[in-house]
UniProtKB/Swiss-Prot annotation:
The chain crosses the membrane at residues 21-41, 47-64, 77-97, 100-120, 124-144, 152-172. It comes from the Bacteria. GO terms for molecular function: ATP binding; phosphoprotein phosphatase activity; phosphorelay sensor kinase activity. The modification Phosphohistidine is found at residue 194. It comes from Vibrio cholerae serotype O1 (strain ATCC 39315 / El Tor Inaba N16961). PANTHER family: HYBRID SIGNAL TRANSDUCTION HISTIDINE KINASE C (PTHR43547:SF2), TWO-COMPONENT HISTIDINE KINASE (PTHR43547). SMART domains: HATPase_c (SM00387), REC (SM00448). One of its GO terms (cellular component) is plasma membrane. This is CAI-1 autoinducer sensor kinase/phosphatase CqsS. It catalyses: ATP + protein L-histidine = ADP + protein N-phospho-L-histidine. Residues 191-416 form the Histidine kinase domain. InterPro entries: CheY-like_superfamily, HATPase_C_sf, His_kinase_dom, HisK_dim/P_dom, HisK_dim/P_sf, Sig_transdc_His_kin-like_C, Sig_transdc_resp-reg_receiver. Its EC number is 2.7.13.3, 3.1.3.-. SUPFAM superfamilies: ATPase domain of HSP90 chaperone/DNA topoisomerase II/histidine kinase, CheY-like, Homodimeric domain of signal transducing histidine kinase.
């Protein structure tokens, strides 16, 4: 057969999703155009019978799913006949019968486009078109009395040929892209199945071993069972091996995902990394098959360097190279990974003494899906390595002596090179920055830089920031001005609670000439930035915060904090003994001296008998409440009448807060307050 049935079935399967639409268009369009060409724009020849036959054929495509099952198996052949009859044959026949009129020449060209779209196989389409046009000629000259004045209108032929040839070329390009995607999907599925079979088999074996160590439920006669030391060690060994198997399986999946996903080779997560740290971790975590393989890998560090890129991508690239090396190993096998520098580039050399690669294959090994002599391989590893190195601004090349050695050289641009700076500049355009503060000089500098470098910039005050939800801080860089955040004692703890959910880098802008009466959240990763540095070199500071986080010291101790004054005495007044005791312990741990009272009536007695620097008082107490006690203090004629008083209340309604202000209290804390809120509030007033 010129065209096999398998090819016809593939053509039908490709067109099947669009057949209902095409069928309805043909079933309705063929009769409708009879009236157009017969009455609206009359042509010299029309054939209603031929149009009805075409409409009936297209109707079969519309109702194909309603046909008996035994008929549906013939649908591929029926489809091919219908397309051949209704497109190239019908339009060629009508063009000849209308003596090559312009309207029918244009109609024939339109049918060519539809023919190319519906029959994706170029050979089938070309044979069908040629055969149908020949049959049309035979029908015109052999079955009708009409004979066209011109056998072939040669001026139309170049246009028809151009449409067929270039239409097929464009369609062929799209088809190749489609088949590549399908191939990638199949490869990915096959890779997952292959890579997971061994880990699952290992887990199954581990489960079987554990099952032999425990009694079966049917034979269990006791409620308690004991394990000896050997059995316990074996169980732990099995569990550890199971963890290793799961880790290896996850690595395999991640490697496959990054190998086939173009988006994963993206500079979005690029940062400054130490190549030695990355390679040491990769060599340590690579899923070796046995201890001998692990001992065969040697790392030589001649000149360490930093690179701009992704540590994860470089790790997976190295995994690919090691995986290939171990697959083609031979006796006395070894791998040497060396790190060195030249005058222009930084290099990683991965050299093994395996079987080597033939010279004629060296040019093909970086092509997608190319593989040779390797069962279970899908030709994704080395192309992935090339994509990674290209994204880093570098290259990868291979040299080999067949039967002796293979060496891959990964070349990186220097960290301070123009290549890396260009990558940073483009990457900076995708970043977003928010400044939380009221320093207009900083706002102007950052806004100007944002315009020049085209990154997103937002500026808000600390008061505005505390009203935002945590999801509204999805920025790559967050700069918090301590001058604004500490203007009121309670803002910083609230902001730190919200920022603890942020994934971006957080910088605290401080003035070295000031001291801050705050306790910075020890669990929050922050980078201190002096106000002078960000005003002098804003671009350098931002690039360091975005791209060099791991190499920054993050020494929060450079922020000048107000030293605790251990001689300060605080009076804690609360009728709840638990709260009073807890608060006293917390303050004493910070070096304060604490005096306790359980009612407002005792406040004046303590203040008359000793020096008190701050009163922390509950508002609602049974005998004399905090508001009344505050009024008594403010209305007295003693020196302590101006002592700072912080109210402690569980009611934060506007009415209660208004009473707090009118009573003479300096500040308030809403119950329940966490440790940082309490300490920051106290530090702000003593």
């Amino acid at each position: 057969m010129i065209v096999s049935m398998d090819v016809i079935k593939r053509v039908y399967q490709y067109a099947e999703p669009n057949l209902s639409l095409v069928g309805w268009m043909g079933m309705l369009g063929f009769p409708a155009y009879y009236f157009i060409w017969e009455y609206w724009f009359p042509q010299s020849y029309e054939n209603l019978g031929l149009r009805c036959a075409a409409a009936v054929l297209f109707g079969g495509l519309v109702f194909r799913d309603s046909m008996p099952k035994k008929w549906q198996r013939y649908m591929p052949g029926y489809f091919l006949f219908t397309i051949g009859f209704c497109l190239p044959f019908f339009f060629a026949f009508m063009m000849l019968m209308n003596d090559w009129s312009t309207i029918w020449a244009m109609s024939f060209m339109a049918s060519i486009f539809l023919h190319i779209l519906l029959v994706h196989d170029t050979r089938v389409m070309a044979l069908q078109a040629l055969f149908s046009v020949l049959v049309a000629y035979l029908a015109v000259y052999g079955l009708t009395d009409f004979h066209p004045t011109t056998l072939i209108e040669w001026q139309y032929i170049p246009i028809f040929l151009f449409t067929y040839v270039f239409g097929n070329l464009c369609f062929f390009r799209n088809q190749i892209s489609h088949e590549t995607k399908v191939s990638i999907a199949k490869t990915f599925g096959a890779g997952i199945a292959h890579e997971m079979r061994n880990p699952l088999s290992a887990l199954k074996t581990s489960i079987d071993v554990v099952r032999t160590m425990i009694p079966k439920p049917q034979t269990a006669a006791h409620t308690d069972y004991s394990l000896d030391a050997q059995e316990l060690d074996l169980l732990h060994q099995i569990l550890n091996e199971a963890d290793d198997v799961i880790y290896s399986g996850n690595n395999a999946i991640d490697l496959l995902l990054t190998s086939i996903d173009e988006n994963r080779v993206s500079p979005a997560s690029f940062k400054k990394h130490s190549v030695v740290d990355v390679i040491e971790k990769a060599v340590k975590t690579f899923p070796y098959k046995n201890a001998a393989d692990q001992h065969s890998v040697e790392l030589e560090v001649h000149q360490p360097f930093d690179f701009f890129g992704s540590d994860t991508l470089l790790t997976y690239a190295l995994f690919n190279l090691l995986k290939n090396a171990f697959y083609y190993q031979k006796e006395h096998f070894s791998v040497c990974i060396s790190i060195e520098q030249t005058s222009e580039h930084n290099l990683i050399r991965v050299r093994d003494n395996g079987v080597g690669i033939a010279p004629e294959m060296l040019e093909d090994i970086f092509r997608d899906f190319y593989t040779f002599g390797k069962n279970g391989s899908y030709g994704l590893g080395l192309p992935f390595c090339r994509k990674v190195m290209s994204a880093f601004g570098g290259t990868i090349r291979c040299a080999s002596q067949q039967g002796q050695w293979t060496e891959f050289v990964l070349s990186f641009p220097r960290y301070d090179s123009d290549t890396v700076n260009e990558i940073k500049t483009e990457l900076l355009k995708t970043k977003s920055l928010i400044y939380i503060g009221s320093n207009q000089a900083i706002v102007r500098e950052l806004n100007q830089l944002a315009v020049e470098d085209e990154f997103g910039f937002t500026a808000i005050s600390a008061q505005q920031a505390v009203r935002r939800q945590d999801y509204e801080f999805e920025f790559d860089l967050i700069l918090l001005d301590l001058d604004d955040a500490t203007a009121q004692g309670e803002l910083l703890p609230k902001l730190e609670g919200t920022l603890s959910f942020a994934e971006g880098c957080i910088g605290y802008v401080y003035d070295p000439g000031k001291t801050y009466a705050v306790n910075i959240n020890r669990y929050l990763r922050i980078q201190p930035i002096s106000i002078h540095s960000i005003l002098r070199k804003p671009r350098k500071i931002i690039e360091r915060l975005l791209f060099e986080q791991e190499s920054l010291s993050m020494n929060r101790n450079v922020i000048p904090l107000q030293k605790s004054r251990h001689e300060r005495r605080i009076l804690v007044v609360d009728d709840n003994q638990s709260i009073r005791t807890f608060t006293a312990i917390l303050l004493e741990q910070q070096g304060y001296e604490v005096v306790q009272a359980n009612d407002g009536s005792e406040v004046l007695k303590h203040m008359e008998s000793q020096n008190i620097d701050l009163v922390l008082m509950d508002i609602e107490m049974p005998n004399v409440g905090g508001l009344e006690a505050t009024r008594l203090i403010r209305n007295s004629e003693h020196e302590y009448k101006n002592i700072p008083i912080i109210g402690y209340t569980g009611d934060n309604s506007p009415k209660t807060l208004a009473l707090v202000q009118t009573s003479g209290m300096n500040d308030f804390i809403v119950k329940p307050a966490d440790r940082d809120v309490l300490l920051n509030k106290v530090a702000a007033w003593v």
